[in-house]
Amino acid sequence: WKAAKPGEPMWDSPWGKGRPGWHTECSAMVHRYLGTPIDIHGGGQDLQFPHHENEYAQAMCCWHEPLANVWMHSGMLLINGEKMSKSLGNFYTLKEVLDKYPADAVRLLMLQTHYRSPLDFSFDRLDGAVGTLERVRGAVANLRWAAESSSASGHELNDADRAFGKAVDDAAAEFTRQMDDDFNTAGALAALFGLVTASNTYLDEAGANVAGSVALRASD
C-alpha cells in the first residue's frame, strides 16, 4: 500500500489514504481478468525479486493458490556487451531495427540465445542471422528441388539414403529434446543447423541419385 501523493488517485484504507503498490496491482489484475493460477508468468530477471516474489506471496495469502504454474525469467538485453540504456546512447527501438532487417532475422538472433541468458545484440550478429537464414532456406529449397527432380524416387534405398534418413530422424528428436529442456532454443537450432550441413553433404554426394522421399522428409 502506497501512501497518497498529491495528484495521484487515492482510496481510504485502515492504513490511511493511498493506493495499491505495483505488486498488488499485478496480482489483482491477473486474478480478476485471467484467473489464477495462470499457466506462465514471464518477465526479466530483474523482476524476479522483489516483484515476482511479492506477487507470489500475495496470491498465496489472498487466494491460497499460486499466481502461476510456471515462472520464466529472461536474461537482460545488452548492446555490444553493455546494458541497453538511453544515457549510454545505445538504445534502439524495434521499429528502427525492423526498418533495416527482416523480422525473421531478429527472431533468429533471439532464438540463438537461451531465454535465461543475457542477449548481446549487435548489428554484426544480426547480419550473421540474415546469412544463416539464407543458408537454411537454401538447403530447404535444394532438398525440395532434388525431391521433385529425382529420377531415383522409386529406387531401393542405399546406405547413404538410410544414413541421411537417420540423420533427419536424429535431428528431429534432438530438436524436441532441447525444446523440452527448459525451452532451449539455442540447442534446438544447433540440431537444425547440423541437419542443414548433413543435407548439403548428402545432396552433393548423391548427385542425381537422390532418394526423393528422404529429401522431401528432410525439407519438411
Where are these regions (language model features)?
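Structural preference for alpha-helix termini/caps and helix-kink/transition segments
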Residues: K83-S85, N90-D220
